[in-house]
A protein has these predicted regions:
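Short, polar/acidic, helix-capping and beta-turn segments at strand->helix junctions
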Residues: 1-153
Length: 153
């Protein structure tokens, strides 16, 4: 089954691809590698999910924010590649959580994005290697930022 069909069957709506927040490329293709710059939890209304996890958001709200980051990444891929079916697999995900120092469930939060990608590309191709880490702050006080390296067909 195709990634595009899987997305449709999930009934999820992609937000618009986020605008750039600085001097960088949202997507860079090098051979069969597709690098996607860090994305935040961008919503349909153009706003972002903000706040510090463990203070302003609980772990489940943060996990939902990470899923929203995944949707924003999918929107950027579609805008730049034309179709999610051009992606073969997820290679590496780096998830950054804006959290209080005592928060320890960063991997649980980033599962929001990883589980989405597994549903889009299947377990074999949608799950790659990953790091999930905590930060004292993120740009614009966003709750989660994620960057991903994909392999193209």
């Amino acid at each position: 089954m195709s990634a595009e069909k899987n997305l449709t069957e999930l009934g999820l709506t992609l937000p618009p691809a986020p605008p750039r927040g600085g001097v960088y490329k949202p997507v860079l293709i090098d051979g069969k590698h597709c690098y996607v710059s860090g994305h935040g939890p961008y919503l349909l209304n153009g706003k972002s999910i903000t706040g510090k996890v463990g203070k302003d958001l609980n772990e489940d709200e943060a996990k939902n924010a990470a899923q929203q980051v995944g949707l924003a990444i999918l929107a950027t891929l579609k805008e730049n590649l034309g179709s999610l079916d051009k992606i073969k697999r997820v290679i590496k995900t780096l998830g950054m959580v804006n959290a209080i120092p005592e928060f320890e469930k960063h991997p649980y939060v980033i599962n929001g994005c990883s589980e989405l990608f597994a549903k889009i590309w299947g377990d074999d191709n949608g799950i790659g290697v990953r790091s999930a880490v905590g930060f004292g702050s993120l740009p614009g006080n966003i709750a989660v930022e994620i960057e991903v390296l994909f392999e193209l067909h």
